[in-house]
Amino acid sequence: MEEEKVKEGLWELAYNLWWTWNPPAKELFRSIDPLLWKETKENPIELLRKTKLLENKLKDEDFISHFKYVYSLYKTYMNRHSKYEDTYKKPIVFLSPEYGLHHTLLIYAGGLGFLAGDILKESSDLGFPLIGVGFMYPQGYVKQRIRVDGWQEDLDAQNQKELMPVKKVLDKEGKWLKCYVYVRDEKVYFGVWEVNVGKTKLYLLDTNVEENTPWNREISSRLYVPDKDLRLRQQIVLGFGTVILLEKLGIDAGGFHINEDYPSFVFLAEIFKLLKKGLTWDKAIEEVRKISLFTTHTPLRVAVNTYPFHMIEEQFLFVKDVYGIDVKKVLELGTNPEDPSEGFNSTIMSLRLAKYVNAVSKRHQEVSSKMWSFLFKEKENPIDYVTNGVHFPTWICSDLRRLYEEYLGENFVELHDHKSLWELIRDIPDEELWEYHIRNKERLIEHIKDRARERWVKEKADPSILMAEGLFLDSDVLTVGFARRMTGYKRPDLIFTDVERLKKIVNDSERPVQIIFAGKAHPADIEGKKIIQRIFNFAKDPEFGGRIAFVEDYDELLAHYMVRGVDVWLNNPLPPLEACGTSGMKASMNGVLHLSILDGWWIEGYNGKNGWAFGDYEVEGDRNRADAEAIYNILENEVIPLYYERDERGVPVKWISMMKEAIKSITPNFCSRRMLKDYINKFYSKILKEEG
């Protein structure tokens, strides 16, 4: 094969995120320049731009052979046909304010984004016609820096598009495709970027274009801005911009699925489109409702987006002149009938304009149905549920894949949502599964120490910071992981309720424990920042003996290391505020045991043999103390003894039995394949039938 064709093929692979969940492709890029691969944090685009070793590799027969193998896998995947493509001729358009696809594409903040990313990946794997739309955030989300006093500083993270897997969408003249929407009476332009997620397309809107005024260029600048006016403009551009973009691209949407209320104005944009065609207001709403799905993630009414009525009125004054509709009709869509004073509520608008609504776990359905019941007094509450799932090929460790290929069969990835497949996990020898797990723990600790070393070299950081960030971690020690957004209701510091008792647990000379924390607080979340500071200062405290670590700037790369490398995944939000949670699913699929309060998905996932649970009790008085006490008791009486109980080979046989049960029970039930099939069967098939 000609060298230029190999280069073209490598660039094609680098610009399609298919490589991120296919280990042979990862290994292909790593083999080009292993040191640079590590330095670039596994970014193939940056690797190909910077490496000086590629020319030699192109003369290496083994490398060329490896490339041909990977490229053939890729082409076979991209060209395969699915039953869904035959059944559904129009796509579902999926809108989300964030997407967690890979750490080289920093347009995510947390779990909501990774759920969206996993839906795109799974739609590609299943061959289901789905298109994603979101924002290209030039500044992404905050970069976290922890000061010596433990306080989180929020640094701007400038996205370097030339190093990201994004390309400009071009118009018929070969120029960057730009569209515009009206925000109030002003044109706001946006350029369009494209991301290839396997066979699925993701389009990203970017208002940072020269046609815009400085204040309008800021609309898509970063995720989750606190300023209400800017946030509303984001919502308007995402909703109305999506409809305009689809028209420009000639895409006839079969239906719309919004991930939280942020993109809710897409429903209104569709209504206006039908008004132009001559439909009445009520008939337009009726037609849009038929093809609309709203997924709610919020278990608290105070956490939804609300705006003063005058802001909405200013945006939609034109409806009187253009459509003969009183602007009050628009305002009524988002008005709480029990408390109009709260302003325009975009979640309420979403609930009114979507025929199909789902919560993200069975427990969350119960909470949401009760929370919004006042909207459905005269009719049946429409809130169904689809419990979240995670993309198995993305989150599973490559070592574990090799074990599965040997003992479950080469096509285990295609069959991973089949429960019967996982009965075969009993055939994996305990010592082999344990060897895999220990390797991953060693890699996690090495990665954490590399991050600390990098900060030492680049910043000459205070040694106490490096100690707190994990320099003393030990792969022989029982390791607990806690990694997620740092905010009050998730109670990250709950385990420090009884500091002296925790010191005894972690410093036990024969059976020590270490705890690794990671996660960012929202820039405006002062309580979350105080929690981080508290944990970080405990990590610096010599009395904890280096057994507590807080790793700064949690990202998707660190998440991969953590959900594979710790022994226990701790989860202790204040119930019922965990809508679902997904990090514990990722951990369980990798044989990491889940220790969690009974909330969110764990109510459905826990079977008494695949982890530990607490919180199924009524508490009078201090809930935090009761839950902390439960965690200490489980650690002291169950987790620690089980982990350190070894046979003559040094293998914790009973622990591994629980690992196998976790993998067997969680993988088929909480994978994104099961989730997407649920969406198809419950909602998408009905929406596309309505449209058809």
Curated annotation (Swiss-Prot):
Gene3D superfamilies, A to Z: Glycogen Phosphorylase B (3.40.50.2000)
Record bears the keyword Transferase: yes
Modified residues (N6-(pyridoxal phosphate)lysine): K586
InterPro entries found in the cross-reference section: Agluc_phsphrylas, Glyco_trans_35, Glycogen/Maltodextrin_Phosph, Glycogen_phosphorylase_DUF3417, Pyridoxal_P_attach_site
PANTHER family per the UniProt record, alphabetical: GLYCOGEN PHOSPHORYLASE
NCBIfam families xrefs: more_P_ylases
Known function: Phosphorylase is an important allosteric enzyme in carbohydrate metabolism. Enzymes from different sources differ in their regulatory mechanisms and in their natural substrates. However, all known phosphorylases share catalytic and structural properties.
Protein name: Glycogen phosphorylase
Annotated organism of origin: Aquifex aeolicus (strain VF5)
